[in-house]
Amino acid sequence: LLPKNINKSERRPVVVCQHGLEGRPQDLADTNNETPAYHRYACRLADLGYIVFAPQKPYIGADNFRRLQRLANPLKLSLFSFITRQHQRILQWLSSLAEVDAQRIAFYGLSYGGKTAMRVPALLEEYCLSICSADYNEWIWKNASAHHKYSYLLTGEYEMPEFNLGNTFNYAEMSWLICPRPFMVERGHHDGVAPDEWVAYEYARTYRRYVELGLADK
C-alpha cells in the first residue's frame, strides 16, 4: 500500500505487516475486509503516511505447512528458516525502491506474525524496529504446561516446539537480540494468548535489559 501524495524525491518509512495463523494479506491490507483481529491495521498505517507491505507467509493450510516443518527438522531447519530467507529478499527489494527510506523499515506482526516479529528482526538487522502483537509469551510454559488452558499441548499446533529453544532463547533473549533497536509488545488482557502474569514475568526481563543500557524509552 502506498500513501497518497508521495513526492518524487521523497523517501517514506515502511512497515512490513505480517498476518497470523491461516491468514492472508487481505485480512490486514484490504479496505473492504474488516476483521475483529486485524481491523485493517495495514490500511490505517498507510492512511498515516507509511508505505506498507503485507507478504503471504507459509503458515496456512492446516497440516500441509506442519508437514513442511517436520520435513525441515531433520535437516536442522524450521519453518522460520524459510521465512527468514523470504524476509531477506523482501528487505532487498524494498530497499531498492526509490520511494523507500531503507533505514526506516519496521516490522509489525500479529499472532503467528508476532512470532515472526520475535525471530526474524533478531536475525535481520535491516529492520529498524519490531512490534510483537498478540504473541509475546513465556515460551517454555506456553509449550510445556499440561495444566494451563493457554498451553500448546492442548491444541492441534504440534509444530510449535522448536528443538532446544527453551534451553537457549526464551522471548526475552530474542528481544535482547533486537536491542538496541526499538521493540514493543502489544497485547490484550483477554486475548487468549497468555495470562497477564506470564507476559509480565517475561517482559520484565526484556525491559530490564533496555533500562540497563539507558534505552528505556525504546
Where are these regions (language model features)?
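Cap/lid segment of the alpha/beta-hydrolase catalytic domain
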Residues: 10-96, 142-146
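Glycine-rich nucleophile elbow surrounding the catalytic serine of serine-hydrolase chemistry
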Residues: 109-121
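Short beta-strand-to-loop junctions in surface cap/lid or active-site-entrance loops
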Residues: 1-11
